[in-house]
Amino acid sequence: MKIVVAKNIGFCFGVERAIRTVEELLDEGKKVVTDGEIVHNKQVMEKLTKKGLKVSSEITDGEVFVVRAHGIPKDRLEELKRIFPEVVDLTCPIVSQLFKTAQRYAKERKVIVFGKEDHPEMVALKGYAPAIVTKVPFKLEEKKVVFLSQTTSSLEEYKEFVVTMIRMNEFEEAVFLNTICPVTVNREREVEELSRICELSIVVGGRHSSNTGKLFRIASKHSKTIWIESPDELPADVVKYGTVCVFSGTSTPNSLIENVVRKLKEMEGKRDGTI
């Protein structure tokens, strides 16, 4: 079995910054709280909560409140600053830029965002601009619009959405901006290319991770594909495949990917009788 590990794996810079900051605050002995997953990864969150991070939607006290990488609505941020002695905003810089862009364009035209309405990033965005968030093309009366995208969306799916919207409507002015994170785009392209040469693609990442789901869908077009959160989820028949490719979402730590590769090698060794 040949194991091919993608070059673009592990944390993106926004996730890495968020986790590093939370760990530093906890190491300082501060009571750190937040209202949801810092990142969409089960193992990472278990590690942080064991170190002392408190996660609850109804938190009202603590020394430090940390804003997740996905961001939160503007009004909520101001409210938290009145409640907590210290608020650390760990919103990904690329996500913050999306919020600012939506806010700016909302002054002159309708903002349409390609994304999942219930995703934390999109919930936060609506706190900055009165945007329509959807992945389904629709008819619209407004004549001046701007198209934006959730930062973890598929670029190709976003383009298809915009083209369909323009065909369905009679816009006088339509601005199209690529607000997708370049890190996720690079991973998307690598998965598109590598999965074509694989008999089996393994996508490692949290079940709630939007960008991991995107990579799974892309790989599934070209090869047998499985989505796992841990090495324990690897199926016994994985050893029957000649070429296995390993990909990861941006909230998946390198250590988890290394454990998956180690498990694959152990399974192959047992099949061959070498261990």
Curated annotation (Swiss-Prot):
4Fe-4S among keywords: yes
GO MF annotations in UniProt: 4 iron, 4 sulfur cluster binding; 4-hydroxy-3-methylbut-2-enyl diphosphate reductase activity; metal ion binding
NCBIfam families the UniProt entry points to: ispH_lytB
HAMAP family, A to Z: IspH
Cofactor note as given: Binds 1 [4Fe-4S] cluster per subunit.
Protein family according to the UniProt entry: Belongs to the IspH family.
Top-level taxon: Bacteria
BP term (GO), one: isopentenyl diphosphate biosynthetic process, methylerythritol 4-phosphate pathway
Cofactor: [4Fe-4S] cluster
InterPro entries attached to this UniProt entry: LytB/IspH
Keywords: 4Fe-4S, Iron, Iron-sulfur, Isoprene biosynthesis, Metal-binding, Oxidoreductase
Ligand binding (dimethylallyl diphosphate): H40, H70, H119, S209, S210, N211, S251
Pfam families noted in UniProt: LYTB (PF02401)
Residues reported in the UniProt entry to bind (2E)-4-hydroxy-3-methylbut-2-enyl diphosphate: H40, H70, H119, T151, S209, S210, N211, S251
Active-site residues, record numbering mapped to chain: E121 (proton donor)
Residues annotated for [4Fe-4S] cluster binding in this entry: C12, C92, C181
Name this polypeptide is given: 4-hydroxy-3-methylbut-2-enyl diphosphate reductase
Listed pathway(s): Isoprenoid biosynthesis; dimethylallyl diphosphate biosynthesis; dimethylallyl diphosphate from (2E)-4-hydroxy-3-methylbutenyl diphosphate: step 1/1; Isoprenoid biosynthesis; isopentenyl diphosphate biosynthesis via DXP pathway; isopentenyl diphosphate from 1-deoxy-D-xylulose 5-phosphate: step 6/6
Residues that, per the record, bind isopentenyl diphosphate: H40, H70, H119, S209, S210, N211, S251
Keyword Chaperone attributed: no
Reaction equation(s) it catalyzes: isopentenyl diphosphate + 2 oxidized [2Fe-2S]-[ferredoxin] + H2O = (2E)-4-hydroxy-3-methylbut-2-enyl diphosphate + 2 reduced [2Fe-2S]-[ferredoxin] + 2 H(+); dimethylallyl diphosphate + 2 oxidized [2Fe-2S]-[ferredoxin] + H2O = (2E)-4-hydroxy-3-methylbut-2-enyl diphosphate + 2 reduced [2Fe-2S]-[ferredoxin] + 2 H(+)
Record-listed E.C. numbers: 1.17.7.4
Role: Catalyzes the conversion of 1-hydroxy-2-methyl-2-(E)-butenyl 4-diphosphate (HMBPP) into a mixture of isopentenyl diphosphate (IPP) and dimethylallyl diphosphate (DMAPP). Acts in the terminal step of the DOXP/MEP pathway for isoprenoid precursor biosynthesis.
